[in-house]
Amino acid sequence: MQVPQDGEDLAGQPWYHGLLSRQKAEALLQQNGDFLVRASGSRGGNPVISCRWRGSALHFEVFRVALRPRPGRPTALFQLEDEQFPSIPALVHSYMTGRRPLSQATGAVVSRPVTWQGPLRRSFSEDTLMDGPARIEPLRARKWSNSQPADLAHMGRSREDPAGMEASTMPISALPRTSSDPVLLKAPAPLGTVADSLRASDGQLQAKAPTKPPRTPSFELPDASERPPTYCELVPRVPSVQGTSPSQSCPEPEAPWWEAEEDEEEENRCFTRPQAEISFCPHDAPSCLLGPQNRPLEPQVLHTLRGLFLEHHPGSTALHLLLVDCQATGLLGVTRDQRGNMGVSSGLELLTLPHGHHLRLELLERHQTLALAGALAVLGCSGPLEERAAALRGLVELALALRPGAAGDLPGLAAVMGALLMPQVSRLEHTWRQLRRSHTEAALAFEQELKPLMRALDEGAGPCDPGEVALPHVAPMVRLLEGEEVAGPLDESCERLLRTLHGARHMVRDAPKFRKVAAQRLRGFRPNPELREALTTGFVRRLLWGSRGAGAPRAERFEKFQRVLGVLSQRLEPDR
């Protein structure tokens, strides 16, 4: 395949399908490795790579980075994750021939292009219409009518020219005008353009007379305030989704909220007093697994959850947990109104401030609730010993998938390790012995890697650099700011206190880096709605204590459930 150095012949590529809806694209993808490139109507015409990988259809938006116009270099670069390319064909060629994954999160590899078999020009009526006024079809040349005169700008240009199709960069003298169109702006045309236009018109004599031109203008220039500037710096621009009515909105958008870039802060934004109650965890969200009223530990729901977790490998579950933790912490998906209400740009900064008290309590409850649910996954196995050992192995593998260098979700890792180190679980000698006998690698990883790592994180000495970590360990700092005393001898507790405060300061400083790393981890990831809900704080709270008990005081709820876990542990392995 010829690799062009610019994006002018994208429409000529066999794998480019023009404007194509998500559903029709998925219908064309039959086998693993099949892929095509399409223009997404819901993403403002931006190119999207659709592929099938491991039985699932995945969609990756190609981001455009505008460059300052200079002779001899492209006007834009295109990228999926980190590496940038001068054109979309060059990007596709690199990923296809090199067998490189489109994203590290999914590992999807494209190998077989799905060729477009239809005519070159496709109309909007064939696929999904864009929301809003009619627009020029992206990345396809406009089909000019017979009544429009030939021009060098159109005769010499190939059938696809993104730069030429934009009104902001198209010369006004090159715009076609019928006899009834009003003159928008008179500008002297270069001599070469006039001469070439005269030569081009010699070959444009039609056999029949052209149709009568319309009485209304065929093309209108937008106001100067609406046109984007032709001068631009090297700034990634992610177009925003056009607003749609509720009846037209799609339940699964092309670009989820965790992939959208944060809005730029206004320079002269007026100061607003931060609100005392900031929450990123919706408490009244509708549930697809629980009814409006439910009792604690419903057997049918527990059976459904068991099958749900068995269907997903630990790496996928870790990404689901990272997504929910980033939302609960306020690292991703924070709106401009929320930033204005809390006075800072992310929840990591809010945790260190006095008015972050409510968020700190929410994260403490989330940590303890997930730890109790993990312990229940082991203690609720009333079958043979091997079943409980398999549950332990599943938690250990999930912890390994959450550790730094993998998903990098340290709050999720702390919750899973809290379940494994809970006294009601750690006392099960026969179960742990069976784990060492049947799943030796998991047992060694728990003893030699996970336990020392968790000890270092709790003492403020573990890894916390962005890149290795997507979401830092906030529990020690949250407990400290909520007034909990640091355990241990006085000299050791003072050193631990200083390390915790030092780590909190670095966490706030590196909050934008953590946000970028988390977004890269989740780019291209499409979660299972049920598994994602099963990892939210509100769902786990209702699962453990029921719809009525979920509103009881936190200390009372945890004390009662600890006793329930103690009874289950004694039933499995009574004291000698």
UniProtKB/Swiss-Prot annotation:
SH2 domain span: 15-114
Statement: the UniProt record of this protein carries the keyword Phosphoprotein: yes
UniProt cross-references to InterPro entries, sorted A to Z: Ras_GEF_dom_sf, RASGEF_cat_dom, RASGEF_cat_dom_sf, SH2, SH2-Ras-GEF_adapter, SH2_dom_sf, SH2_SHEP1/BCAR3/NSP1
Tissue expression remark: Weakly expressed in placenta, fetal kidney, fetal lung, adult pancreas, adult kidney and adult lung.
Record-level Gene Ontology MF annotations: guanyl-nucleotide exchange factor activity; phosphotyrosine residue binding
Gene3D superfamilies documented for this protein: Ras guanine-nucleotide exchange factors catalytic domain (1.10.840.10), SH2 domain (3.30.505.10)
PTM-bearing positions, type Phosphoserine: 123, 125, 147, 180, 201
Superkingdom per UniProt: Eukaryota
Region (Disordered): 145-165, 204-227
GO BP: any one term: JNK cascade
Post-translational modification: Phosphorylated on tyrosine.
Record keywords, A-Z: Phosphoprotein, SH2 domain
PROSITE patterns listed in its UniProt record: SH2 (PS50001)
Phenotypic consequence of residue 265 to G: In a breast cancer sample; somatic mutation
Stated role: May play a role in JNK activation.
Subunit structure: Interacts with BCAR1.
Entry protein name: SH2 domain-containing protein 3A
Organism: Homo sapiens
